[in-house]
């Protein structure tokens, strides 16, 4: 049996900072009259004929079950007294830059994941502070004192655990996961809390009887690889607190895409359009996960003879709407010259990305 080595670097000190309900918190800070009231960042459905989606909301609104990517119409139905604010991205970006400068006081090894969250590697920090927890507390203090906002912090020896830790106690929490506590911490977590495990993977894991980190720990590595491929390799390690991904300084994501290679070639238009739909939904979900919008849709088609065609369309407005991405990608495919060779690869990529408040219209 093939056995892959388990290499666990526990020497690093990683902090994950996640701003608490960032856009809504900025609005509350600038308008104290909003405090204690349900605030939703998104277009008011009463002014748009029920169109639009929720970008984010404050914790008061979340008590009503409102969450990001929910239709504004449903958010209003859940909480008619909610206050809808379209949002001011330029203001949020300015505040985000202010927070980034605070991070840079402690380390230059900062990987922003979006406008309101980032990983920091403070193993060799600028101030020579040995305790990552102390640095996390100082950052929380600085952000509150200078920016007037709260954030949650997770501290551990890798990005995976630090991210989980920052989600553990919100808002304004700080959670430390030591190497000796990692297995116990992960064992109790529902599998859907594992960062990177999507809805379809959760369903598949549940079908396998895997509901918690403890359940995952009991599954042989090759079983996970057989079911999930490379992702199974990662899952096996994450269940053991192993993730050696580095913090990439000032990483800027330039594109988000999804592509698939087919062992059985695609010939029928219905099959091709079905795969375009799957890729479009995957891209839309990734855009949502990374809090991005995109403007340029790129379709990639590789035929059985290895002829590869790539064509792009730039939209007039930013989007992360799955139906729109699918429609445009389908139109691109229809515009391509016919090729009798079967298709071995299909992919959709979104470029011209921006962090932005989602004020996308939806047909509801």
Swiss-Prot record:
CDD domains: PolY_Pol_IV_kappa. GO terms for biological process: DNA-templated DNA replication; error-prone translesion synthesis; SOS response. It comes from Streptococcus pyogenes serotype M28 (strain MGAS6180). It holds the Pfam family IMS_C. Residues 14-198 form the UmuC domain. Binds 2 magnesium ions per subunit. InterPro entries: DNA/RNA_pol_sf, DNA_pol_Y-fam_lit_finger_sf, DNA_pol_Y-fam_little_finger, DNA_polymerase-Y, DNApol_IV, PolY_HhH_motif, Rev_trsase/Diguanyl_cyclase, UmuC. The active site is at residue 117. The gene is dinB. This is DNA polymerase IV.
């Amino acid at each position: 049996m093939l056995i892959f080595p388990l290499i666990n670097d526990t020497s690093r000190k990683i902090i994950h900072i996640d701003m608490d309900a960032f856009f809504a918190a900025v609005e509350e800070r600038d308008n104290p009259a909003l405090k204690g009231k349900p605030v939703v960042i998104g277009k008011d459905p009463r002014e748009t004929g029920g169109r639009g989606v929720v970008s984010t909301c404050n914790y008061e609104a979340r008590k009503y079950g409102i969450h990001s990517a929910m239709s504004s119409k449903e958010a209003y139905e859940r909480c008619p007294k909610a206050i809808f604010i379209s949002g001011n991205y330029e203001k949020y970006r300015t505040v985000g830059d202010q927070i980034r400068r605070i991070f840079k006081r402690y380390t230059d090894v900062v990987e922003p994941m979006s406008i309101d969250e980032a990983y920091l590697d403070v193993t060799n920090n600028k101030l020579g502070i040995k305790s990552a927890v102390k640095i996390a507390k100082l950052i929380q203090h600085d952000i509150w004192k200078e920016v007037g906002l709260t954030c949650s912090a997770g501290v551990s020896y890798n990005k995976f655990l630090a991210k989980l830790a920052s989600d553990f106690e919100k808002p304004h929490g700080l959670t430390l996961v030591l190497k000796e506590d990692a297995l116990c911490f992960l064992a109790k977590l529902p599998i859907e809390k594992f960062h990177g495990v999507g809805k379809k993977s959760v369903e598949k894991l549940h079908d396998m009887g895997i509901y918690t980190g403890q359940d995952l720990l009991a599954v042989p590595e090759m079983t996970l690889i057989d079911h999930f491929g490379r992702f199974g390799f990662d899952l096996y390690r994450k269940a053991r607190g192993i993730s050696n991904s580095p913090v990439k300084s000032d990483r800027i994501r330039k594109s988000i895409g999804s592509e698939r290679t087919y062992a059985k070639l695609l010939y029928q238009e219905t099959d091709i359009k079905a795969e375009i739909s799957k890729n479009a939904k995957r891209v839309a979900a990734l855009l949502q996960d990374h809090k991005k919008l995109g403007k340029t849709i790129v379709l990639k088609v590789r035929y059985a003879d290895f002829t590869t065609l790539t064509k792009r369309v730039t939209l007039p407005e930013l989007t992360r709407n799955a139906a729109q991405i699918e429609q445009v990608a389908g139109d691109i495919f229809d515009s391509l010259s016919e090729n009798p060779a079967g298709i071995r690869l299909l992919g959709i990529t979104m470029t011209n990305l921006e962090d932005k408040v989602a004020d996308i219209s939806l047909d509801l």
